[in-house]
Every structure is written in C-alpha cells, then in structure tokens.
C-alpha cells in the first residue's frame, strides 16, 4: 500500500465505522503520517487545517465525509429524517473552505443523490458511498487527461516553474499542473522544475519539491522573490499552475502569489498555463472579481514554523493573509482541462469548451 496516497476510504464493516484516511500534509516533508477521520467534525477540521488540501482533493474528502454522517440505518429513522441529516452535513462541510469550487461541486453531487433517493435508509448510505468513490475515480481519469494535453504544450521545454502544489498531493493521482510533468517523465523527457516556495505555508518547498523528488523528477526550490530573476536569466521556458476556481471569462483564482507570477511571465514573454478540471470552472461568476477569497489566520505569517516557535512579526503589527489571488484571463496563455486546451481564454471560448 502506498503510504503517500493522499486519500483512502474504508467502508463500515462488521460494526467498524467507516474511515476517511488522509495523508497529513501539515507534517510533510519531515514526517509521513496519516490522520483517520470517523466523524464529520474531524473531516471539516482536516479540510480547514489543510491536512488535506488542493481543490480536487478537498472535494473528494468532503464527498467521503458526507458518508460519515451518523445515520443509524437499523433504527426507526424515517427517510426524510435521514435525508435532513445528510443535507445538514453537506451544508456544514461546505463551510470548511470558501474559495475552491470543487468542494461545492462534489457536495452538490452528493446532495443530488440525497434529494433524488426514495428507497431504504440503509441503501441511501450505500448510494452515497458509491457516488463518493465515483468522484474519486473520475478525478484519477482527469489527472491522466490533463497530463496528456499539457504535455503537448511543454514538450519543447527544458525547464518550467510552478507555484504552490497542484500535484498528486492535491488530487487522487498526478495532479493538475504537475500532471504534464509526470506524463513527460514517464515518456523519458527530461524536464527541470522550479518550485517556488509559496509563502506563507511553503506548499511549493514542502509539498511540490517533496513529491517530485520522490518521483525522480529534477526539482529545484526557489524563493518567491527569485522568480523574476530566473526568468530574466532565461532559465524558465514556461510557467504552469493549478486553480481553485475559474470564472466564466477565464479569470483564475489560485494560491496567493500566482498573479505576480503571471505578470512576470507576461513581461518576459514566457507562456503562462493554468491546469484545472472543468469542475473548477464557475460559469455563474462573470469574472474573477466575484470569486470569494478566503482570509486565513495572521498566525500563519507571524509564526511560519508554528505557534510554538518564535514570532517573526512585531507584536501589535497588523497582518493580511489572503489564501488566494485572482489572475486576469488576459495574462493566461492557455487553460488546460481534461477536455483539451483553451488558448487565450475569454468568455466565449470558455462557454464553448464547457458546452454551455
């Protein structure tokens, strides 16, 4: 069994409760440990604390989390009562992180199962487990497809830069932004990856560098402020990142620091690619200005090594810590999805790609 597998699920069996088994990414790269959730509160906390993170992964985790709803199929609970409890769980898990639309997409799929069901209560849980597994399996196929489409754009590159972590740790398999790198690596194509550290939580330095190194893909960590210098030196052939939400016009919400990276890439005439599944698109939002941006604790900036370590900002000084920023579509060379590539995205192209 792969100990680095991001998400596992163990169905209830012989009186043993169902378990959502997560790789604890807050402990990487120093410690490889897992966190087992058996309640919806534990699942909510794991998503909120970034034990599991990455837009596709939190959607999968939330879907499995719905199945942990305490509904006793052997009791006299009526179907309407059970449905009400599942809906309550879905609403609760939706509050764990506000920006990643994959979370709401996965929970909407689970809600549809609850709303449309008309059989025994015990069978409803089975249907929900089946749907969560299907969401997990769909994500694996998405990773393969994005890897294939993205590889065609990076085939002539010798080095690429990426931001945050949009790899296997953020999904069920290869990831989104890192999927083309895995695809090319399997094909024997040598590609160096610059992983910028991604402050304040260092997902690039801690997670992307770790998983690529584990896979044998050459990776070099650089500070966030070093990116422009590397581009000016001609050491970066392309930039590729993931996304947590994409508006109808192609504007992209991704980890804070993505927007300045896109500006730098534009200035240096370097392609800037965004890789994300179609369920990351929010066609109801006309532009990125409408995307809700999660504001996280100031402690993540003031105590970068944890609150038990020395404070790195002066006491009493204000700290701003948005988790995401928005990159305008005009800075995006192409969007890469499991369906293909949207070059120079705009509203018309996005709608056509999504079949709207």
UniProtKB/Swiss-Prot annotation:
Q: Which superkingdom, per the lineage?
A: Bacteria
Q: Which residues form a coiled coil?
A: none
- Pathway info: Amino-acid biosynthesis; L-methionine biosynthesis via salvage pathway; L-methionine from S-methyl-5-thio-alpha-D-ribose 1-phosphate: step 1/6
Q: Where is this site: Transition state stabilizer?
A: 164
Supply the alphabetized keyword list: Amino-acid biosynthesis, Isomerase, Methionine biosynthesis
Q: Where is the active site?
A: 244 (proton donor)
Catalytic reaction(s) noted: 5-(methylsulfanyl)-alpha-D-ribose 1-phosphate = 5-(methylsulfanyl)-D-ribulose 1-phosphate
Family annotation (InterPro entries):
IF-2B-related (IPR000649), IF-M1Pi (IPR005251), IF_2B-like_C (IPR042529), Initiation_fac_2B_a/b/d (IPR011559), M1Pi_N (IPR027363), NagB/RpiA_transferase-like (IPR037171)
Residues reported to bind substrate: 53-55, 97, 203, 254-255
One BP term from GO:
L-methionine salvage from methylthioadenosine
According to the UniProt entry, where is the signal peptide?
Answer: none
Q: What is its EC number?
A: 5.3.1.23
* The protein's enzyme class: isomerase
Xref: Pfam families: IF-2B
GO MF, one term, reads: S-methyl-5-thioribose-1-phosphate isomerase activity
Instruction: Tell me which PANTHER family the record gives.
Output: METHYLTHIORIBOSE-1-PHOSPHATE ISOMERASE
Q: Do you know which HAMAP family this protein is assigned to?
A: Salvage_MtnA
**Protein purpose:** Catalyzes the interconversion of methylthioribose-1-phosphate (MTR-1-P) into methylthioribulose-1-phosphate (MTRu-1-P).
Q: What does the similarity note say? A: Belongs to the eIF-2B alpha/beta/delta subunits family. MtnA subfamily.
Q: What is this protein called?
A: Methylthioribose-1-phosphate isomerase
Q: Give the species.
A: Rhodopirellula baltica (strain DSM 10527 / NCIMB 13988 / SH1)
Underlying gene:
mtnA
């Amino acid at each position: 069994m792969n100990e680095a597998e991001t998400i596992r699920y163990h169905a209830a069996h012989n009186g043993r409760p169902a378990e959502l088994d997560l790789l604890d990414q807050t402990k990487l790269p120093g410690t490889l440990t897992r966190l087992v959730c058996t309640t919806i509160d534990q699942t909510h906390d794991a998503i909120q604390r970034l034990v599991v993170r990455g837009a596709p992964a939190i959607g999968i985790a939330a879907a499995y989390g719905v199945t942990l709803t305490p509904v006793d199929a052997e009791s006299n609970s009526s179907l309407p009562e059970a449905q009400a409890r599942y809906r309550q769980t879905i609403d609760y898990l939706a509050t764990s992180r506000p920006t990643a639309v994959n979370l709401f997409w996965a929970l909407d799929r689970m809600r549809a199962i609850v709303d449309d069901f008309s059989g025994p209560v015990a069978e409803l849980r089975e249907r929900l487990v089946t749907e969560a597994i299907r969401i997990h399996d769909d994500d694996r196929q998405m990773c393969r497809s994005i890897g294939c489409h993205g590889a065609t754009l990076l085939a002539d590159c010798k080095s690429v830069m990426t931001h945050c972590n949009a790899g296997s740790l953020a999904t069920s398999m290869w990831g989104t932004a890192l999927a083309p790198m895995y695809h090319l690596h399997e094909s024997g194509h040598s590609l160096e990856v610059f992983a910028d550290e991604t402050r304040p939580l260092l997902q690039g330095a801690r997670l992307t560098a770790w998983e690529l190194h584990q896979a044998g893909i050459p990776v070099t960590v650089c500070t966030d402020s070093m990116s422009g210098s590397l581009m000016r030196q001609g050491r970066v052939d392309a930039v590729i990142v993931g996304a947590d939400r994409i508006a109808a016009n192609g504007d992209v919400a991704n980890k804070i620091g993505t927007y300045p990276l896109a500006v730098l890439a534009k200035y240096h005439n370097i392609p800037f690619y965004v890789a994300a599944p179609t369920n990351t698109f929010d066609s109801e939002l006309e532009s990125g200005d409408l995307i809700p941006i999660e504001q996280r604790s100031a402690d993540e900036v003031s105590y970068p090594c944890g609150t038990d370590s020395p404070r790195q900002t002066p006491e009493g000084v204000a700290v701003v810590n948005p988790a995401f920023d928005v990159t305008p579509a005009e800075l995006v060379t192409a969007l890469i999805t499991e369906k293909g590539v949207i070059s120079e995205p705009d509203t018309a192209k996005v709608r056509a790609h999504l079949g709207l």
